[in-house]
C-alpha cells in the first residue's frame, strides 16, 4: 500500500483524455488500493458535489468528512442535507472543533477570524482534519489546478507533508466550466450561494462574492493576505 512513510513517485498512469479527465479512473484505483482506509474531506462546494457524485459511482458507502466550524452558511448545511438524501449510503460525518464558537470567543477574544484568521482556521479546520485523518493512510481532495497559482502543481497523487498522508486529487484537470457542465448534466443539487456570486464558499464571516472571474477564490479572507485555510499549504 502506498503511504506517506513509504512514498515514492507513483508509476501509475491514469487515463486523462476520457470524459472524466482521469477522475473516475483515479477514484477506482484509490478505492481499490485503500478501500475503507480512504476518506474524503469535503467542503460541499460545487467541486465537492461533483466529486461526491463520482465517488458514489465507485463506492456507495464512502466516508465523507465535513469540517463543521460552527460558522458556515445555512445554505451549506442545507446542501449537506440534500446530499444525504440523494446518497443515503454515504457515511457523512460532521467533524467539530474542540471549542464551540462561544468558548473560542471567551478564551481567545471575540471574532478571532478577524483578529487572527490564521489561528482561527488552525483551531477550527486544521486540527479537526488532523484528528479526522488519524489512522487513514490517504485522503481525497477536490483541488483543481485552475483554482489558484498555489494549486497549479497539484498531481493526482501527492505526498502530503501537512498531514503526513497521501492526498488523492481526482479533479486536477477539470476546469470551472467542466464542473458546471457535469453538475448540469447530472442534475446535481448544489449550494445556492454559487448562483449569488460565490464561486468559493467557506465560513460565513470570511466569505464574500468573488471580486473577479479570473480569481475564483478572491472572495475568501477579503482584506487580508490570507489565501488558504491551511489545509493545502
Curated annotation (Swiss-Prot):
GO terms for molecular function: 4 iron, 4 sulfur cluster binding; adenylyl-sulfate reductase (thioredoxin) activity; metal ion binding; phosphoadenylyl-sulfate reductase (thioredoxin) activity. Its cofactor is [4Fe-4S] cluster. The keyword Flavoprotein does not apply. The active site is at residue 229. [4Fe-4S] cluster binds at residues 120-121, 203, 206. It is found in: Cytoplasm. Its EC number is 1.8.4.10. Binds 1 [4Fe-4S] cluster per subunit. It catalyses: [thioredoxin]-disulfide + sulfite + AMP + 2 H(+) = adenosine 5'-phosphosulfate + [thioredoxin]-dithiol. It holds the Pfam family PAPS_reduct. GO terms for cellular component: cytoplasm. CDD domains: PAPS_reductase (cd23945). GO terms for biological process: cysteine biosynthetic process; hydrogen sulfide biosynthetic process; sulfate assimilation, phosphoadenylyl sulfate reduction by phosphoadenylyl-sulfate reductase (thioredoxin). Pathway: Sulfur metabolism; hydrogen sulfide biosynthesis; sulfite from sulfate. Keywords: Cytoplasm, Iron, Iron-sulfur, Metal-binding, Oxidoreductase. Its main location: cytoplasm. Catalyzes the formation of sulfite from adenosine 5'-phosphosulfate (APS) using thioredoxin as an electron donor. Belongs to the PAPS reductase family. CysH subfamily. This is Adenosine 5'-phosphosulfate reductase. The lineage of its organism: Bacteria, Bacillati, Bacillota, Bacilli, Bacillales. The gene is cysH.
